[in-house]
Amino acid sequence: MDNLNRVASGPDVRTLMAEIGREARKAARTLSLASTETKNSALLAAAAAIRTKAGAIAAANAQDYAAAQAKGVAGSFLDRLKLDPSRIEAMARGIAEVAALPDPVGRVLARFERPNGLVIERVAVPLGVIGIIYESRPAVTADAGALCLKAGNAAILRGGSESLRSAALIHDCLVAGLLEAGLPAAAISRVPIADRAAVGEMLSGLNGDIDVIVPRGGKSLVARVQNEARVPVFAHLEGVVHIYIDRAADLAKATKILLNAKLRRTGVCGAAETLLVDRACAATHLAPLVKTLLDAGCAVRGDAAALEADPRVSPASEADWSAEYLDAIISVRLVDGIDGAIAHIEAYGSHHTDCIVTEDPAAADRFLAEVDSAIVMHNASTQFADGGEFGFGGEIGIATGRMHARGPVGVEQLTTFKYRVHGDGQIRP
């Protein structure tokens, strides 16, 4: 398997990917039986290796960054690609935090006894082999590899060409951790070629050797995965995130939340993209909120009321209401109370993350109950839509579907279950 991770050309893509799949399946069987101590040892060794190689990772990332910059890619893309010393340390710390999490494998989720004396247990087990397809985020290599390992799953990582140098070094650190703990290197495999045909092979399921696909990237990548995958997918297509300012909102609190939700990092999927303001508080809240955004360097595209609130506002088009900007841009609209906010979110949202700012508990309860998103918030920045912030030790992605996993996908969501039935000679009449 080591040779596969060094190959740049040679065997055709289908043959290469089939071998990666077979080796990952073998490794998954080993991982499913690995002890908590063994998995944690591998994770801690990987974290230590990343710290040791931090300088080399930063240098490789600088090359990736310069190459992407020369191509003229968007600022939000560059932000996701960048690994400075603090982000590299955060990556190592994140792996160690995953090691400190409770082992999700082997948990008894339910236990009951039947009238005939059978004792039935529902027990958490690994999913198997997880394929992760990602673009500009080299840190996904560490996050995804660590989370899959903790949950007893093998991982097949296919990063984008833009982060190839960074991802290769991070992957080397993960493999070093595996080998130090006596686990197979194929437990965390990296697709060593940039050929897009490799993605197609992964989406086919590699002859049954991939159990789940997780895409991390732009809309076109996620759409392709969702349309073409022949195995289950954990994903979200877009993060059209709303903040609704209710008539009972505290203006100072709303301002603080809004600025953080929009501008802390504009390129993350939890960044706010649309501000909805209750018409009942527009006279006191709309202009100050819009001014604060504009003064902070955020472009505002708004409806007629927002245009009147500040001459720097540009008119919003219909497309703006469903736009995921991933930039310092926000759309602003007045709505008729909580009914209007919920209706707007239902019409234009992406079921990712939405927030209400209010001091009215009844309004908050209704919003949290009726907005059909994976994450709904009350009086908190939407940038908390993150597995690490949820205490999951990071995330492999955020899922907005309804099957199996929804919201941040952490170690618990990377397991399924089986039933263990204990008897004492019972036969069925």
UniProtKB/Swiss-Prot annotation:
Statement: the UniProt record of this protein carries the keyword Oxidoreductase: yes
Protein role: Catalyzes the NADPH-dependent reduction of L-glutamate 5-phosphate into L-glutamate 5-semialdehyde and phosphate. The product spontaneously undergoes cyclization to form 1-pyrroline-5-carboxylate.
Species in which this protein is naturally found: Methylocella silvestris (strain DSM 15510 / CIP 108128 / LMG 27833 / NCIMB 13906 / BL2)
Keywords from the UniProt entry: Amino-acid biosynthesis, Cytoplasm, NADP, Oxidoreductase, Proline biosynthesis
Record family assignment: Belongs to the gamma-glutamyl phosphate reductase family.
Molecular-function GO term, any one: glutamate-5-semialdehyde dehydrogenase activity
Family annotation (Pfam families): Aldedh
Entry protein name: Gamma-glutamyl phosphate reductase
Classification via PANTHER family: DELTA-1-PYRROLINE-5-CARBOXYLATE SYNTHASE, GLUTAMATE SEMIALDEHYDE DEHYDROGENASE
Pathway the protein takes part in: Amino-acid biosynthesis; L-proline biosynthesis; L-glutamate 5-semialdehyde from L-glutamate: step 2/2
Subcellular location: Cytoplasm
Any Gene Ontology CC annotation: cytoplasm
Primary residence: cytoplasm
One GO term of the biological process aspect: L-proline biosynthetic process
InterPro entries reported in the protein's UniProt record: Ald_DH/histidinol_DH, Ald_DH_C, Ald_DH_N, Aldehyde_DH_dom, G-glutamylP_reductase_CS, Glu-5-SA_DH, GPR_dom
Chemical reaction(s) catalysed: L-glutamate 5-semialdehyde + phosphate + NADP(+) = L-glutamyl 5-phosphate + NADPH + H(+)
E.C. no: 1.2.1.41
